[in-house]
Amino acid sequence: MNYRFTNILKVIIFFCFIFEIQSEEIQKPYKNLEKALLNPADVRNLDLSFLGLKTLTNKIGQLKNLQKLDLGGNEPTILSKEIWQLKDLQKLNLNNNKLTVLPKEIGQLQNLQELSLHSNELVNLPKEIGQFKNLQKLNLDNNKLTVLPKEIGQLQNLQELSLLSNKLISLPTEIEQLKSLKNLDLNHNELTTVSKEVMLLETLENLDLRSNKLKTIPKEIRQLKSLKVLMLTGNQLTSLPKEIEQLQNLKTLNLGENRFQIFPVEILELKNLLELNLYYNQLVEFPKEVGQLKSLKYLSLYHNQITTLPVEVTQLPDLQELHLSGNKITILPKEILQLKNLEWLSLSNNKLNALPKEIGQLKKLQRLELGNNQLTTLPKEIEQLKNLQRLELDSNPISPKEKERIRKLLPKCEIDFEGGGGE
């Protein structure tokens, strides 16, 4: 009985394998239009990317069942009108072309779910873009857009809107109507304020506002209850609104390259925060209350003006990476070495002249950056770091004899005495 059952099982597995291979063959994209036209009714996926095409034959309109079309990396300054007759099209890629205008006929693609237009030369969008009732992803990165049409608000099923590297100075009020939006990327634009309408996007999980000209964040940010990632790097912020502490689902907060002189204490209420970046600011103190962020795994404060570390940092039991390079730290408190889960510790470009022997307690440490300090020796306990893969000690006054001693203490570790790789 077991033998027969085993044979039957083998037969079932065999046919499943054959079926999977056939399915993969059906989904495999055609790379040649002429070959695709031999069996036009069977073609679902056509990839004509990076072929140097400047025109497109009107025969493409024969592919009535086409669902995915990739025309990226060509130079069709005028798109074939037959494309707009492909009513079953779900995914359209027009990246890396030289398009300056998007024809209004594009609105005829009622079944479109993904539209990618990044790296073109578009200065505006036709109002017909609002006709994409099924559109879920819209990528407009690297264009020359200064405004968005108000019809953008009609994209009720849109989940991802990417507008990186454009010239937007504001957003239409209708953007608040995007009730399904989860990801909004406005990185590298010309925004001086965040419109309150953005703060009404209750489903938003990822908001990227890096490299704009923001000086303040509106208190209405408290309404983004679903927000998990907030990127504010490269702006002109000096403070945060108290209301930000209501974002209890926030996992990642990036505030690097701003103008903070005082640690924004509002952050301390974000109990579920996993990653906090405050690099390249003007902070002089590291608040002892940071120990309240019990879930924190990644903390980056490199290139500030911090002189001392509070012992309360040991209250971050899950911390895996601590980046403090480019500060003015003179002493590393032995308590900090109780961070049992620490894997990466960066202390380059400080004023350390010694390490506590407790360094050996960091059993999970894989990378230790100590370049450009005033160290002349390391404690013997460094040999206890069995998982250490890289140690950076460049630009320290360490003698050749001491270097040889350190190498013997860590025979399996890559040790850099010359420089090349720290923050």
Where are these regions (language model features)?
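Aromatic (phenylalanine/tyrosine) cluster motif
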Residues: Y3-F5, F14-F19, F132, F260-F263, ...
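N-terminal capping/linker segments that flank leucine-rich repeat
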Residues: M1-Q67, S395-E423
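Periodic short-repeat tracts
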Residues: K91, V101, Q110-E114, N134-K137, ...
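Ankyrin-repeat and related helical/solenoid repeat scaffolds used for protein-protein interactions
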Residues: Q338, E343-K401
